[in-house]
């Protein structure tokens, strides 16, 4: 079948819930809705986590893969059965959960919060290796007069690899000053960039 998958935030409930809707291109099929499990580390990420308050969601074959920027666990939902599973994916090097932000409205505090906590990025499937990868950055001290550009490039950066069943294989600390912190991540076919 052909369908579109999209993530939505349901604000009609408290705390807000996240869902994935599968919209079929065939007219006679109803929309399917899959409820994402809340973060096991913090069931309500809508309050106190600044810019880390929504899940990272990806799709692979018949699965929804997601995680939360504030914590290290991974989650998977089977699109055929609707059943979900959580996977422990702790870092060996960093804290596995972000602390709450001190302010709900002060953007300076939001920036500080973003630097002084780990941030877990989305889980990506690497088809040529039949495995998964997740990147995350560690917390770093944030001074009031710091150059944010330099500070963002000096954070410790980690790659965590998982087999095709989401079992952790290895975690590697990557060199600092070798990545752009202001972009989304993606995998490339053979591991080489074409310029």
Q: What do the PLM-derived regions correspond to, one by one?
A:
Residues 114-164, 168:
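Loop/turn-rich, solvent-exposed surfaces of beta-rich toroidal or solenoidal domains
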Residues 195:
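Conserved small/polar residues in nucleotide/adenosyl-binding loops
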Residues 1-16, 39:
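Asp-box/WD-like beta-propeller blade repeats and closely related beta-sheet repeat scaffolds
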Residues 30-51, 85-115, 172-180:
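Surface-exposed loop and turn segments in beta-propeller and other repeat-based domains
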Residues 10-15, 71-73, 139-143:
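Short glycine/acidic-enriched loop and turn motifs that connect beta-strands
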Residues 1, 48-60, 115-129, 184-192:
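Structural signature of eukaryotic scaffold interfaces centered on beta-propeller domains
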Residues 15-29, 72-77, 148-167:
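Beta-propeller blade signature
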Residues 6-8, 66-69, 135-136:
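Conserved beta-strand positions in repeat-built beta-propeller and related beta-rich domains
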């Amino acid at each position: 079948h052909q369908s579109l998958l999209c993530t939505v935030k349901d604000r009609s409930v408290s705390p807000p819930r996240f869902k994935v809707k599968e919209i079929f291109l065939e007219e006679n099929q109803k929309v399917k809705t899959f409820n994402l499990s809340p973060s096991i580390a913090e069931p309500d990420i809508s309050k106190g986590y600044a810019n880390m308050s929504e899940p990272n969601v990806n799709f692979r074959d018949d699965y929804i893969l997601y995680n939360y920027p504030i914590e290290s666990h991974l989650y998977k939902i089977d699109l055929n059965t609707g059943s979900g599973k959580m996977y422990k994916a702790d870092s060996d090097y960093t804290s596995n959960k972000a602390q709450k932000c001190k302010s709900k409205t002060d953007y300076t505090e939001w920036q500080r919060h973003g630097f002084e906590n780990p941030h877990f990025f989305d889980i990506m499937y690497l088809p040529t290796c039949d495995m998964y990868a997740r990147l995350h950055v560690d917390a770093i001290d944030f001074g009031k007069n710091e150059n944010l550009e330099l500070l963002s490039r000096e954070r410790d950066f980690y790659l965590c690899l998982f087999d095709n069943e989401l079992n952790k294989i290895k975690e590697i600390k990557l060199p600092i000053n070798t990545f752009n912190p202001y972009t989304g991540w993606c995998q490339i076919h053979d591991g080489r960039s074409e310029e």
